């Protein structure tokens, strides 16, 4: 996942 400190691997979204 590009950018973001934490990202939901399952949804591939930035938190």
Curated annotation (Swiss-Prot):
Where does this protein reside within or beyond the cell? Secreted
The lineage's top-level taxon is Eukaryota
Entry annotated with the keyword Lipid biosynthesis? no
> Where mainly found?
secreted
Report if keyword DNA damage is assigned.
Answer: no
The record's top EC class is hydrolase
UniProt keyword annotations, A-Z: Blood coagulation cascade activating toxin, Disulfide bond, Glycoprotein, Hemostasis impairing toxin, Hydrolase, Protease, Secreted, Serine protease, Toxin
pH dependence, per the record?
A: Optimum pH is 9.0 (at 25 degrees Celsius).
Q: PTM comment for this protein?
A: Seems to be only O-glycosylated (is not affected by PNGase F which only removes N-linked glycans, but is affected by TFMS that removes both O- and N-linked glycans).
Regarding tissue, the record states: Expressed by the venom gland.
A GO cellular component annotation here is: extracellular region
Q: How is its activity regulated?
A: Inhibited by PMSF (100%), AEBSF (100%), aprotinin (50%), benzamidine (50%), guanidinium chloride (48%) and urea (66%).
Which Gene Ontology molecular function entries are recorded, alphabetically?
serine-type peptidase activity; toxin activity
According to its UniProt entry, the protein's GO biological process terms are: proteolysis
Q: How does activity depend on temperature?
A: Optimum temperature is 25-50 degrees Celsius (at pH 7.0).
Q: What is its EC number?
A: 3.4.21.-
**Sequence ranges assigned to domain Peptidase S1 in this UniProt record:** 1-15
Q: To which protein family does this belong?
A: Belongs to the peptidase S1 family. Snake venom subfamily.
Q: How does it assemble?
A: Monomer.
Query: What role is this protein assigned?
Result: Thrombin-like snake venom serine protease that has high fibrinogen-clotting activity (2025 NIH units/mg) on human fibrinogen. Shows esterase and amidase activities.
Q: What is this protein called?
A: Thrombin-like enzyme acutobin-2
Q: What is the lineage of its organism?
A: Eukaryota, Metazoa, Chordata, Craniata, Vertebrata
């Amino acid at each position: 996942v590009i950018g973001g400190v934490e990202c939901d691997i399952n949804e591939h979204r930035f938190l």
